[in-house]
Amino acid sequence: MKHIRNFSIIAHIDHGKSTLSDRIIQICGGLTEREMAAQVLDSMDLERERGITIKAQSVTLDYKAQDGQTYQLNFIDTPGHVDFSYEVSRSLAACEGALLVVDAGQGVEAQTLANCYTALDMNLEVVPVLNKIDLPAADPDRVAQEIEDIVGIDATDAVRCSAKTGIGVPDVLDRLVRDIPPPEGSPDEPLQALIIDSWFDNYLGVVSLVRIKNGTMRKGDKIKVMSTGQVYNADRLGIFTPKQIDRDVLNCGEVGWLVCAIKDILGAPVGDTLTLARQPAEKALPGFKKVKPQVYAGLFPISSDDYESFRDALGKLSLNDASLFYEPESSTALGFGFRCGFLGLLHMEIIQERLEREYDLDLITTAPTVVYEVETTAKETVYVDSPSKLPPLNNIQELREPIAECHMLLPQEYLGNVITLCIEKRGVQTNMVYHGNQVALTYEIPMAEVVLDFFDRLKSTSRGYASLDYSFKRFQTSDMVRVDVLINNERVDALALITHRDNSQYRGRELVEKMKDLIPRQQFDIAIQAAIGNHIIARSTVKQLRKNVLAKCYGGDVSRKKKLLQKQKDGKKRMKQVGNVELPQEAFLAILHVGKDSK
């Protein structure tokens, strides 16, 4: 046991976590030279295309240290994006230590801080590593000072390495073996294994990634899931050396995978505890706290025949991504679909792309909204995650919107631009601290503004130097209204949006203008209106296509022409009463961009 080291690699986006993992795998000989590829742990196509890590991956390697002993390293490569912070906290729960990788050129950024504090809260040993020292812009001494100033951990002897060229990586491993404590727990106690992650394999059923806290797990054991009480047979188990390798036993302190032929997707929930059926543990391990989704959107299959396969796909995906929430929803305009909850907009994009790619679905997304707290006149409190569920205006006593606490780190010269952006987003400054050339800003900004496009705008105003970390703070009373869209006097539920009263006129007008360009012309006039309650705030008309009925009149009496025009007018009027308008897919997407292009 004292030769096992479990650790995660945490860092901000693009500070070189996955490349460092590659080097560690190479040094320990986990893969042959031929099998080695860049970012070997980013196995999903999407991860490779976007160059980001989405899923945490685990690897078990043997490392011969300088003291001549062989250590077993179990490490987990984690994502750096704020939307996937839940993946990071789950990975950290399985470890005793973490490598905090910081780019020696860019220095400390917001996610570095957030992930590091998560690790320190869990009482993990944090080992700072300065990466990318081969860059001409690298300034390791300044960055080491920054780590001490901003993060507050001692970085005077931080290991310096370059994951790309491989310089200094052996020092990282030696420091790791020296500083990170071995796992606690005893092999003789009843088995307790924590499920860190699961995914669905079409042949094997549910595959779980587990960390053995106490006891040992053998092939063929009867395994009991503590929350459900179900008993399964441990058919296969083993480790990843990135490749799946079968073993007969997983010892105390190890991280490995387990297949129990579970067909039911909810059979082994993430964060649950496994134990032996014949000698069960007294109590379950503390799991993970459930994360609350911050952004909700409706997902609907384009053809209603896909509904069943869409439901199965969501089930399989939610097994792999525990932060995804979904419930059935129906809409008059779009038919049957699901209301899904995500941690942020990037998370939403990734989920939609994974559903479309891995499960061959065509989906329509409605505009993302956040959760509002509504106090009705009957003194009830309801939580509303979709504009169509909002009670009528005269039944609402008070509407509260979620406020996010945003921590930003940015170079001094961009401070003015960023403050202007925050004020425009209805933000309130709560703190500002200078660390050398960096400024740490704390703002309270409404969640609805943060999830819409705040991150993109922050990056563009600061030329990519500012970094952001946000978390839900509280609900606060606010003057929000629902803007409905009426097409030919019929409300289209999928196009409604909730916005602040100050912006509502302007948002309504913008939405109506956008719709006008997107709805194809018909044989009759189409009126597009935006309304708050019964009060119309904007209108535009898609003009009808009409035939020139006077072409056949050559000269002739004016009353003859009037008769023909009147006849055409009556015909169009009848047509308008029975005609209905097909809305194109782009019309639903237009609402996503309302308020974006205007600045």
Swiss-Prot record:
Cellular location(s): Cell inner membrane
Binding site for GTP: D14, H15, G16, K17, S18, T19, N131, K132, I133, D134
Region forming the signal peptide: none
PROSITE patterns: G_TR_1, G_TR_2
Alphabetical keyword list: Cell inner membrane, Cell membrane, GTP-binding, Hydrolase, Membrane, Nucleotide-binding, Protein biosynthesis
Annotated catalysed reactions: GTP + H2O = GDP + phosphate + H(+)
GO cellular-component term (any): plasma membrane
Entry keyword Manganese: no
Catalytic EC class: hydrolase
Domain tr-type G: 2-184
Any one GO BP annotation for this protein: positive regulation of translation
Gene Ontology MF terms: GTP binding; GTPase activity; guanosine tetraphosphate binding; ribosome binding; translation elongation factor activity
The protein's name: Elongation factor 4
Native organism: Pectobacterium carotovorum subsp. carotovorum (strain PC1)
